[in-house]
Amino acid sequence: MGNSAARSDFEWVYSDQPHTQRRKEMLAKYPAIKALMRPDPHIKWTVSGMVLVQVLACWLVRGLSWRWLLFWAYAFGGCINHSLTLAIHDISHNTAFGTSCVSRNRWFAIFANLPIGLPYATSFKKYHVDHHRYLGGDGLDVDIPTNFEGWFFCTPARKLLWLVLQPFFYSLRPLCVNPKVVTRMEILNALVQLAFDVTIFALWGIKPIVYLLGSSLLGLGLHPISGHFVAEHYMFLKGHETYSYYGPLNWITFNVGYHMEHHDFPSIPGYYLPLVRKIAPEYYDHLPQHHSWVKVLWDFVFEDSMGPYSRVKRKCKLAKDHL
């Protein structure tokens, strides 16, 4: 497990991201796609049920041994919490209540955040806007690994460790790459999360807190669902920077696998993204795609051509509202 990844730098390009032009072409050809730009009527009920399931799980694990607690945190809680982060991703595009109810979407994302254990939703939204606007943008898109990550995590063993540590890199990277002022909503997110955690601790002790945090750290680390982190934008085929996954795990991840469709139309909820492909199959069926997130993780670790450097990067001009 000692072979180093072949890449020593990112894949630098000097063209704009492809999704803006694709969006214009597709809307001109298929105006019916605009009808999909509406709230998802199911997500608020699905998310509410998931939050309640995790609260019930907190009660159930209060008497478990530590070994079994960690097992269930990975096998069950990890799936729920990772899925909740993907619900938060969807809600960050105002898909729960529509663009006319921005505040309600933000507060609902904070509610979905509760089982995660740490405040996350508001900060995610702040940076995710840049990910779409400046896809691959140097110093702007914090989804891109740092140069240190690309340089150090270059062997199979180190890439495996990098996957395990994904929650930490996704949390800390924005502070290093593109630090921003803490907003009032982020403070409120933290206070609500603290109140929830203190309440759970007061009711049932430390084990439920460890369960929730373990569910997040284990579920977002080396876990089958975490294949989407790599599948979405890591360059498995030169010249392609966004990939869709068409496999069964879309059922429990709010269709995050339909990632080419999502970047083409960020305002369409995950629930409706399969319809985009159905309406305009010629824009998607011929593109490289994934069918197994586990295989994605395996290939990322053991293919010498893959590593944190396997990302398309570009210089982007700041939009006027960023100046």
Swiss-Prot record:
Pathway the protein contributes to: Membrane lipid metabolism; sphingolipid biosynthesis
Sequence motif Histidine box-1, residues: 89-93
GO biological process: ceramide biosynthetic process; sphinganine metabolic process; sphingolipid biosynthetic process
Covalently lipidated residues, kind N-myristoyl glycine: 2
Main location, first listed in the record: endoplasmic reticulum
Expression sites by tissue: Highly expressed in intestinal crypt cells and adjacent epithelial cells (at protein level).
Record region (Required for C4-hydroxylase activity): 95-99
Keyword terms of this UniProt record: Endoplasmic reticulum, Lipid biosynthesis, Lipid metabolism, Lipoprotein, Membrane, Myristate, Oxidoreductase, Transmembrane, Transmembrane helix
InterPro entries associated with the record: DES1/DES2, FA_desaturase_dom, Sphingolipid_d4-desaturase_N
Coiled-coil annotated residue ranges, if any: none
Histidine box-3 (motif): residue ranges: 259-263
Name of the protein in question: Sphingolipid delta(4)-desaturase/C4-monooxygenase DES2
